[in-house]
UniProtKB/Swiss-Prot annotation:
<keyword id="KW-0235">DNA replication</keyword>
<dbReference type="GO" id="GO:0042645">
    <property type="term" value="C:mitochondrial nucleoid"/>
</dbReference>
<dbReference type="GO" id="GO:0006260">
    <property type="term" value="P:DNA replication"/>
</dbReference>
<keyword id="KW-0809">Transit peptide</keyword>
<dbReference type="InterPro" id="IPR011344">
    <property type="entry name" value="ssDNA-bd"/>
</dbReference>
<comment type="function">
    <text>Binds preferentially and cooperatively to pyrimidine rich single-stranded DNA (ss-DNA). May be required to maintain the copy number of mitochondrial DNA (mtDNA) and play a crucial role during mtDNA replication. Required for retinal ganglion cell differentiation and retinal integrity.</text>
</comment>
<dbReference type="GO" id="GO:0008047">
    <property type="term" value="F:enzyme activator activity"/>
</dbReference>
<dbReference type="GO" id="GO:0090297">
    <property type="term" value="P:positive regulation of mitochondrial DNA replication"/>
</dbReference>
<dbReference type="InterPro" id="IPR012340">
    <property type="entry name" value="NA-bd_OB-fold"/>
</dbReference>
<protein>
    <recommendedName>
        <fullName>Single-stranded DNA-binding protein, mitochondrial</fullName>
    </recommendedName>
</protein>
<dbReference type="GO" id="GO:0003697">
    <property type="term" value="F:single-stranded DNA binding"/>
</dbReference>
<feature type="domain" description="SSB">
    <location>
        <begin position="29"/>
        <end position="140"/>
    </location>
</feature>
<keyword id="KW-0496">Mitochondrion</keyword>
<keyword id="KW-1135">Mitochondrion nucleoid</keyword>
<dbReference type="Pfam" id="PF00436">
    <property type="entry name" value="SSB"/>
</dbReference>
<keyword id="KW-0238">DNA-binding</keyword>
<dbReference type="GO" id="GO:0000002">
    <property type="term" value="P:mitochondrial genome maintenance"/>
</dbReference>
Amino acid sequence: MLRNASAQILKQFVRHRTTDASLTLEKSINKVQILGRVGQDPVMRQVEGRNPVTIFSMATNEMWRSGEGEPVGAGDVTQKTTWHRISVFKPGLRDVAYQYVKKGSRIFVEGKLDYGEYVDKNNVRRQATTIIADNIVFLSENLRDQ
């Protein structure tokens, strides 16, 4: 019974099955969810011949107490901040993000990871990791009231 249920669930993720390993097409998952604060007001950029994109940075924090297992207040709290680049391509969401996302806003972003390359102004090839946003939820009170 459990085997049949598992097989049915797995079939939902398989689009095409074949005996030839080189022709196997299977569904995969690339999903990111982050909750944090916006680090800068968004900018909208457009490269000739391409659709515009709204870009902003977002910070997430990880905190831990150095004295785990000690009484509350006994250990020092350490915090690590990680910065993320968010890109919004979806036309409706792109425009809303450009208009309403502001520095300091607390937001929740769902999307996917994307890795790319670009050439900087000094003609040096650089790697870039970005989150392509599919959904943004505004959590700051002042933004929900606008």
